[in-house]
Amino acid sequence: MLLTETQKFDIFTSILDSSAEAPCAQICNEFHQGNLLDFNTVYNFGKQVDLLTIEIENVNIDALDRLEKEGLTIYPTPKSIRIIQNKATQKNFYKEKNIPTAAYFHFAYLEELKHSYHNSIIKFPFVWKAARFGYDGTGVKIVRTFKDIENLPQGECIVEKLIPFKNELAVIVARNHDGDVTSYPVVEMEFHPEANQVEYVICPARIDDNIAKKAREIALKVADAFDFVGLLAVEMFQTEEDEILVNEVAPRTHNSGHYSIEASNTNQFEQHLRSILNLPLGNTDSKVAGIMVNLVGAEGHTGEVVYENIEKILEIDGVTPHIYGKKITKPFRKMGHVTIVDKDIVKARKVAQQVKKIIKVISK
């Protein structure tokens, strides 16, 4: 989706990805397969480009640091990525910058967590999060019993009290090198209860204007604290008391902004390019209400992918599917998304629910 926008700007693109079958390999000008966590792979790739950006934050940060010191322009900056890569350092950053976030405990390994529980420092229920390498719902678990603790993986983690909340919200902020900044409307996210993956993204969020204003102000504060350049997705909770707490951020184009391709004056992918190229930022207003439905692999299906009933959703006005080009499906793997647009958010929501029931991502 980002490469679609680079083509409009006639930008020569070189991509590094771990998979030889990455869909981007068919679209970019030059493709390199390699381990994103390997220093030499990332460093050698970076020596061949004029400007480097990321699509996933799990990348060898030491290589990026070296490249930046040698003069390569990298956005977002390695300094920002290093903080964001680790949920513990990310939470510490929010605390230092007086950015509202849920109270937390940091543990270097699982035995520390168990010791803390036995000494009544942490209590059930709580949310366990792996400090690193969480992605699309992985690395997050709700812990209600000691048996749940026993089933947690080893390694560095954070623990947060399970806070009742009204809504999960997100704001995408765009900021260029000159410090020009703008934000997209607040969106509302609905998650799958088991996979902890986004099922629906709803724009605009169905919240009071004062809550939306507060969320956008906090998102802008986060971007400013990072001195961020690029696109920053700020995920937040609206608590029962209408507090806004920052959950985490993604330093890249994000699932919560996919609706913008059809619904916004400037989609998030073009906006990311404008930001990192230090161009004027585009209009972030929505033209219509937009809802995104995630397309993920159905449970019980692993193998060559089939998009069952895709022709049926194409009969519905305002519905646009985006298929990512991945050949193999497996349970809960993100395979695409569908955008629904309408002037009426209520109508769009009904169509989104209809689409969710109709289309299925299965295997042959």
Feature roles, as predicted:
Residues 274-364:
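Peripheral (often C-terminal) accessory segments that flank ATP-dependent C-N-forming ligase machineries
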Residues 153-207, 212-246, 250-258, 273-283, ...:
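Phosphate-binding core of ATP-grasp and ATP-grasp-like enzymes
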Residues 81-170, 174-222, 356:
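Active-site nucleotide/adenylate-binding loops and adjacent lid/helix of ATP-dependent enzymes
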Residues 1-85, 89-92:
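ATP-binding N-terminal substructure of ATP-dependent carboxylate-amine bond-forming enzymes
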Residues 161, 261, 338-341:
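Short, well-ordered beta-strand elements within core beta-sheets of diverse protein domains
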Residues 7, 68, 95, 122, ...:
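Anion (oxyanion) recognition and catalysis
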Residues 35-39, 61, 110-113, 146, ...:
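Structural motif corresponding to alpha-helix initiation and N-cap regions
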